[in-house]
């Protein structure tokens, strides 16, 4: 049975977010790099570094946080990041561009795999193409 790399990425980010850690290391694949590029562009993560160890490449992600200005000493709290895998190897979910769901009225994003590559729901609607719904992020 094959590995679901998208589910691995989502689970790693979710676990680090729940434990209030600052960084997460995920295995570097073409799909992972494209998804991380979208997360960086949309502002869900702060920084990405490529790290090589024993001929294997990893991506080191720094999660976004906001400063808490209340209280005597300013502290940092991480954004509560919610990720949900939709299409999976056992049950693929497809949508045309007119029926792509809006997450929180457009506040969240849907990541799709289309014939023109991995893109967000807004980009897919603008280009008028549908595809496989990979995950929701809000």
UniProtKB/Swiss-Prot annotation:
It comes from the Eukaryota. GO terms for molecular function: rRNA binding; structural constituent of ribosome. GO terms for cellular component: chloroplast; ribonucleoprotein complex; ribosome. GO terms for biological process: translation. It is found in: Plastid, Chloroplast. Its main location: plastid. Keywords: Chloroplast, Plastid, Ribonucleoprotein, Ribosomal protein, RNA-binding, rRNA-binding. NCBIfam families: PRK00136.1. One of the primary rRNA binding proteins, it binds directly to 16S rRNA central domain where it helps coordinate assembly of the platform of the 30S subunit. Part of the 30S ribosomal subunit. Belongs to the universal ribosomal protein uS8 family. This is Small ribosomal subunit protein uS8c. The gene is rps8.
